[in-house]
A protein has these predicted regions:
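Acetyl-CoA-dependent GNAT
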Residues: 1-44, 55-61, 65, 94, ...
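Conserved acyl-donor/pantetheine-binding loop and adjacent beta-alpha core of acyl/acetyltransferases
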Residues: 3, 46, 99-101
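Conserved phosphate-binding and hydrolysis motifs of nucleotide-dependent enzymes
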Residues: 19, 23, 49-51, 89
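A generic structural signal for short beta-strands and their flanking turns/coil linkers
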Residues: 32-37, 68, 86, 104
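Conserved functional loop/turn residues at catalytic and ligand-binding sites
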Residues: 40, 44-45, 49, 66, ...
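Conserved acetyl-CoA-binding loop-helix of GNAT-fold acetyltransferases
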Residues: 47-60, 64, 79-87
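C-terminal "cap" of GNAT-fold acetyltransferases
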Residues: 68-71, 75-82, 98-115
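Conserved active-site tyrosine of GNAT-family acetyltransferases
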Residues: 85, 90, 108
Length: 115
């Protein structure tokens, strides 16, 4: 993560409550596109809408950075994350076979033009 934070093409947002870091989300820009690298929420704060807020703000940051398309990959078994991504307009693009040991990864994208 330290390497990611020091990369000039990476941007991260941090969620805090009372100065406690409860989550973060980041992307890596590649020309006019970006890969979402992380969305992490502390276990005790999950299912409270914080992941949605972080991802919504990451999308706004991407727009400010003139990013036209966001990509991500997610474990096929991570149903809550897939639901969140679909709720925010990400579409399934493809599958990475056995990307997570024996589980497939799902590649998703969101076009930001006209968003």
């Amino acid at each position: 993560l330290k390497e990611e934070l020091e990369n000039e093409n990476s941007s991260y947002i941090i969620g805090k409550i009372n100065n406690e870091i409860i989550g973060f989300a980041g992307l890596k820009k590649i020309f006019d596109q970006a890969d979402i690298m992380n969305i992490v929420i502390k276990k005790t704060y999950r299912n409270q809408g914080i992941g949605t807020l972080l991802l919504e703000n990451l999308i706004l940051l991407a727009k400010d950075l003139n990013i036209s398309t966001l990509f991500l990959e997610v474990n096929k078994q991570n149903k809550p994350a897939i639901h969140l991504y679909e709720k925010l307009g990400f579409e399934k693009l493809g599958v990475r076979k056995k990307y997570y040991n024996n589980n497939n990864g799902i590649i998703m994208k969101k076009n930001l033009q006209g968003f």
